[in-house]
UniProtKB/Swiss-Prot annotation:
Chain segments annotated as coiled-coil in the UniProt record: 25-77
Superkingdom classification of source: Bacteria
Record's bilayer topology term: Single-pass membrane protein
Annotated compartments: Membrane
Cellular component terms (Gene Ontology): membrane
Family annotation (InterPro entries): UPF0478 (IPR009293)
Gene label: ytxG
Protein name: UPF0478 protein YtxG
Protein backbone atom coordinates (compact mmCIF):
# COMPACT_ATOMS: atom_id res chain seq x y z
CA UNK A 1 0.00 0.00 0.00
CA UNK A 2 2.89 2.27 0.63
CA UNK A 3 4.12 1.50 -2.86
CA UNK A 4 0.85 2.72 -4.26
CA UNK A 5 1.25 5.83 -2.20
CA UNK A 6 4.81 6.35 -3.47
CA UNK A 7 3.70 5.64 -7.02
CA UNK A 8 0.85 8.07 -6.65
CA UNK A 9 3.18 10.76 -5.29
CA UNK A 10 5.68 10.01 -8.10
CA UNK A 11 2.89 10.21 -10.67
CA UNK A 12 1.70 13.48 -9.16
CA UNK A 13 5.30 14.76 -9.25
CA UNK A 14 5.69 13.76 -12.91
CA UNK A 15 2.35 15.32 -13.78
CA UNK A 16 3.38 18.48 -11.93
CA UNK A 17 6.73 18.45 -13.78
CA UNK A 18 4.93 18.11 -17.15
CA UNK A 19 2.58 20.89 -16.13
CA UNK A 20 5.51 23.12 -15.14
CA UNK A 21 7.33 22.38 -18.44
CA UNK A 22 4.28 23.19 -20.57
CA UNK A 23 3.51 26.19 -18.44
CA UNK A 24 7.12 27.36 -18.89
CA UNK A 25 6.90 26.91 -22.69
CA UNK A 26 3.59 28.76 -22.75
CA UNK A 27 5.01 31.61 -20.68
CA UNK A 28 8.11 31.85 -22.96
CA UNK A 29 5.84 31.91 -26.01
CA UNK A 30 3.71 34.54 -24.33
CA UNK A 31 6.86 36.54 -23.50
CA UNK A 32 7.96 36.44 -27.15
CA UNK A 33 4.48 37.48 -28.29
CA UNK A 34 4.42 40.34 -25.79
CA UNK A 35 7.86 41.52 -27.00
CA UNK A 36 6.54 41.54 -30.57
CA UNK A 37 3.44 43.43 -29.44
CA UNK A 38 5.63 45.93 -27.57
CA UNK A 39 7.85 46.55 -30.61
CA UNK A 40 4.78 46.87 -32.82
CA UNK A 41 3.26 49.38 -30.40
CA UNK A 42 6.51 51.37 -30.36
CA UNK A 43 6.45 51.53 -34.16
CA UNK A 44 2.79 52.45 -34.06
CA UNK A 45 3.53 55.17 -31.51
CA UNK A 46 6.19 56.64 -33.82
CA UNK A 47 3.79 56.52 -36.74
CA UNK A 48 1.09 58.18 -34.66
CA UNK A 49 3.50 61.00 -33.75
CA UNK A 50 4.22 61.48 -37.46
CA UNK A 51 0.54 61.42 -38.30
CA UNK A 52 -0.21 63.88 -35.50
CA UNK A 53 2.48 66.25 -36.78
CA UNK A 54 1.24 66.00 -40.36
CA UNK A 55 -2.35 66.48 -39.22
CA UNK A 56 -1.39 69.61 -37.28
CA UNK A 57 0.47 71.01 -40.33
CA UNK A 58 -2.48 70.19 -42.56
CA UNK A 59 -4.85 71.89 -40.14
CA UNK A 60 -2.68 75.03 -40.11
CA UNK A 61 -2.55 75.06 -43.91
CA UNK A 62 -6.31 74.60 -44.05
CA UNK A 63 -6.82 77.51 -41.66
CA UNK A 64 -4.51 79.74 -43.74
CA UNK A 65 -6.34 78.70 -46.89
CA UNK A 66 -9.71 79.47 -45.28
CA UNK A 67 -8.44 82.91 -44.20
CA UNK A 68 -7.13 83.57 -47.72
CA UNK A 69 -10.45 82.55 -49.23
CA UNK A 70 -12.27 84.80 -46.75
CA UNK A 71 -10.06 87.78 -47.67
CA UNK A 72 -10.52 87.19 -51.39
CA UNK A 73 -14.25 86.77 -50.90
CA UNK A 74 -14.42 90.14 -49.13
CA UNK A 75 -12.41 91.77 -51.93
CA UNK A 76 -14.69 90.17 -54.48
CA UNK A 77 -17.70 91.52 -52.60
CA UNK A 78 -16.36 95.07 -53.03
CA UNK A 79 -15.92 94.42 -56.76
CA UNK A 80 -19.47 93.08 -56.98
CA UNK A 81 -20.80 96.17 -55.19
CA UNK A 82 -18.82 98.41 -57.56
CA UNK A 83 -20.21 96.57 -60.58
CA UNK A 84 -23.71 96.94 -59.14
CA UNK A 85 -23.08 100.69 -58.85
CA UNK A 86 -21.91 100.83 -62.46
CA UNK A 87 -25.01 98.88 -63.50
CA UNK A 88 -27.24 101.33 -61.66
CA UNK A 89 -25.45 104.26 -63.33
CA UNK A 90 -25.85 102.70 -66.77
CA UNK A 91 -29.52 102.08 -66.06
CA UNK A 92 -30.00 105.72 -65.01
CA UNK A 93 -28.15 106.83 -68.16
CA UNK A 94 -30.41 104.64 -70.30
CA UNK A 95 -33.48 106.07 -68.60
CA UNK A 96 -32.21 109.61 -69.23
CA UNK A 97 -31.50 108.77 -72.88
CA UNK A 98 -35.00 107.33 -73.32
CA UNK A 99 -36.51 110.44 -71.78
CA UNK A 100 -34.38 112.68 -74.01
CA UNK A 101 -35.30 110.65 -77.09
CA UNK A 102 -38.95 110.83 -76.08
CA UNK A 103 -38.69 114.60 -75.65
CA UNK A 104 -37.00 115.01 -79.04
CA UNK A 105 -39.58 112.78 -80.68
CA UNK A 106 -42.43 114.73 -79.07
CA UNK A 107 -40.79 118.00 -80.12
CA UNK A 108 -40.45 116.78 -83.69
CA UNK A 109 -44.10 115.74 -83.75
CA UNK A 110 -45.19 119.09 -82.35
CA UNK A 111 -43.06 121.03 -84.82
CA UNK A 112 -43.58 118.77 -87.85
CA UNK A 113 -45.35 121.51 -89.81
CA UNK A 114 -42.58 123.99 -89.11
CA UNK A 115 -39.95 121.43 -90.11
CA UNK A 116 -41.80 120.71 -93.36
CA UNK A 117 -41.93 124.45 -94.08
CA UNK A 118 -38.21 124.82 -93.38
CA UNK A 119 -37.43 121.90 -95.70
CA UNK A 120 -39.66 123.34 -98.42
CA UNK A 121 -38.10 126.80 -98.13
CA UNK A 122 -34.63 125.26 -98.09
CA UNK A 123 -35.36 123.37 -101.29
CA UNK A 124 -36.73 126.50 -102.88
CA UNK A 125 -33.66 128.47 -101.81
CA UNK A 126 -31.40 125.76 -103.22
CA UNK A 127 -33.24 125.79 -106.53
CA UNK A 128 -32.97 129.59 -106.73
CA UNK A 129 -29.31 129.45 -105.95
CA UNK A 130 -28.71 126.72 -108.57
CA UNK A 131 -30.55 128.80 -111.17
CA UNK A 132 -28.55 131.86 -110.20
CA UNK A 133 -25.32 129.87 -110.59
CA UNK A 134 -26.39 128.64 -114.01
CA UNK A 135 -27.28 132.18 -115.12
CA UNK A 136 -23.95 133.42 -113.89
CA UNK A 137 -22.18 130.65 -115.80
CA UNK A 138 -24.08 131.29 -118.99
CA UNK A 139 -23.39 135.00 -118.69
CA UNK A 140 -19.68 134.38 -118.67
Amino acid sequence: MIIILYLSVALIAVAFLVLVIYLSKTLKSLQLTLKNVASTLEGLEGQMKGITTETAELLHKTNRLAEDIQEKSEKLNTVVHAVQGVGASVQQFNTSMKQAAGSVSASVRENQDKINQVVTWSQAAMEIWEKWKQKKKSAL
